[in-house]
Amino acid sequence: HMSAYDADNGDLLWRWYTSPTAQDPMHSTWGDEPQIYPLQRRRNMSPWMTPAVDSERGLFIFGVGSSAPQQPQLAGTNGEWPDRLYQGSTVALDHRTGALVWWAQHHSDMWNDDSVYDRILVDAKLNPSAPNSLGQNPDIDPDQTRELVIGSFSKDAIFYAYDRTDGSFLYARPTAYQNVIRSYDGATGAYTTEPDAIMTAEEGKEATICRENRQIPQGAYSPLTNAYYVPAFNGPCSVMSMRSTEPTIETGYNTTYSATVPSPAAQLGQPEAIDVTTGKTLW
């Protein structure tokens, strides 16, 4: 959960749960009632990196890490958007009350992709035309200066731009090689997962997942160049399978890594500068 305390006396001011309670309408994304994984059985979903703060709008904007169980089938869902919120999502809370303002889900995290990395607040015009686009909003006005939240939010290092006033999806494009996301619906931001990357609830069934493309070192934005800089790399791909049907209390995970294989990318290190307006690679 995310909590706020009074700095003078330590009193709890508010608390917001990163996995929806029964009073949250998004509770239904964890399957039909009676749920296989009600709130008290769910694991992980930690916002374990630093949030962005929009002081003008009074927003905390942050990412939520992977859930457990990791396989949607175990929770009684099919992994389609929106799935088992708020894992794999960017969330904006009113910092005064803890009320949810908006959310945007980037994937159903079956792979410990951890969507917790940099959210950078930028005001810029958009006219996306990246040749490797995974999706873009068809209603973008190229003459409008948008209030954005940008970054490569997860280990897969996909670059995103969202409207930070309401969480609207604007565009997404890959950086380093990944094989987990096929595309995004430009109007809704709904993801489509690559079929071969879907982790099933079948013990021992393996999937080769390529998404180890960034870690804790943060990306950066320069207003001088209007560029986002991502410290990406083409890390090894993981051969993953379900270890058990029950996440462990110690780690929260129920997936095992049986081997690693080289990424099909031509090089390991791949730092990149991306023009925020167009989504094109600068270098």
Model-found features: residue ranges?
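Short sequence motifs at beta-strands and strand-loop junctions characteristic
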Residues: 42-43, 211
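Long, low-complexity segments enriched in small/aliphatic residues
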Residues: 52, 196, 201-205, 211-234
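Short strand-connecting beta-turns/loops that link adjacent beta-strands
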Residues: 56-57, 154-155, 224-225
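Residue position within the beta-strands of beta-propeller blades
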Residues: 62, 151-152, 230
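Conserved core beta-strand positions within WD40 beta-propeller blades
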Residues: 59, 148-149, 227
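Active-site cores of enzymes that catalyze phosphoryl transfer or operate on phosphate-rich substrates
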Residues: 50-55, 60, 64, 87
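Extracytoplasmic/lumenal domain signature
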Residues: 2-41, 56, 74-115, 120-146, ...
